[in-house]
Swiss-Prot record:
<dbReference type="InterPro" id="IPR036047">
    <property type="entry name" value="F-box-like_dom_sf"/>
</dbReference>
<feature type="domain" description="F-box">
    <location>
        <begin position="1"/>
        <end position="51"/>
    </location>
</feature>
<dbReference type="InterPro" id="IPR001810">
    <property type="entry name" value="F-box_dom"/>
</dbReference>
<dbReference type="Pfam" id="PF00646">
    <property type="entry name" value="F-box"/>
</dbReference>
<dbReference type="InterPro" id="IPR050796">
    <property type="entry name" value="SCF_F-box_component"/>
</dbReference>
<dbReference type="InterPro" id="IPR017451">
    <property type="entry name" value="F-box-assoc_interact_dom"/>
</dbReference>
<protein>
    <recommendedName>
        <fullName>Putative F-box protein At3g20705</fullName>
    </recommendedName>
</protein>
């Protein structure tokens, strides 16, 4: 019987590209060769193509301050007939114990990175987490974080850097941006609309963040 270690590299890549993301950390821990292979860009692209070919979309769900991966198969949506297959794939965990103790209330996604926000008021911590590599990055605030603050995670193509947007203050009229490349906050020279009320935390969809908001005049 041929052992896995004796198989051709292209065959090993094909096999590993069909492993679900919840078991990828286990795969990487088996041997250095597999760890290096699964972090290669060509493997990542193939992995994404395989998932797309299944007609399945994956969503993140927060339950009891932890993150779970949920798979939704969309093949059943044809001719206005809805037959969705929903599967709880597993809990996303980190080897870093500080992440495990972090009470997550909001999460935003961009290019494989997660921005996690604590549910505790005045908890001066944000974390940017790459679950694929299990590497958390703690972000220090310029001012104390509050549960009413609004956040977003994005990518600036002009400089090749991920950035965090934060709205804060009594009326969320203050804006600052954190650059992950320079590890620093800055206040952009922009004026925010003062007549907008942000009703709920943002929702991350297809690398963009959306907020449910309305005019102050419509509150009555």
């Amino acid at each position: 019987m041929m052992m896995m270690s004796n198989l051709p590299n292209d065959l090993v890549e094909e096999i590993l590209s069909r492993v679900t993301v919840t078991f990828m950390r286990t795969v990487r821990s088996i041997c250095k060769k597999w760890n290096a292979l699964t972090k290669d860009r060509s493997f990542t692209n193939k992995y994404i193509r395989n998932i797309a070919a299944l007609g399945e979309r994956e969503f993140l769900m927060i339950k009891e301050f932890s993150i779970y991966l949920v798979g939704v198969n969309l093949h059943g949506i044809q001719n206005n007939n809805f037959d969705l297959s929903i599967e709880l794939k597993g809990k996303l965990i980190s080897m870093d114990n500080t992440i495990r103790r972090f009470c997550i209330s909001q999460i935003f996604h961009c290019n494989g990175l997660f921005l996690c926000v604590s549910q505790k008021d005045m908890d001066n911590r944000l974390v940017v987490w790459n679950p694929y590599c299990s590497k958390p990055r703690w972000i220090k605030p310029s001012y104390n974080y509050r549960t009413v603050d609004r956040f977003a995670l994005g990518y600036d193509k002009s400089c090749g850097s991920h950035k965090i947007l934060r709205l804060f203050g009594d009326n969320l009229n203050n804006l600052e941006i954190y650059d992950l490349s320079s590890n620093s906050w800055r206040v952009p020279n922009v004026t925010l609309e003062r007549d907008i009320v942000y009703m709920q935390p943002g929702v991350s969809l297809k690398e963009k963040t959306y907020w449910y908001a309305r005019d102050k005049e419509s509150e009555n």
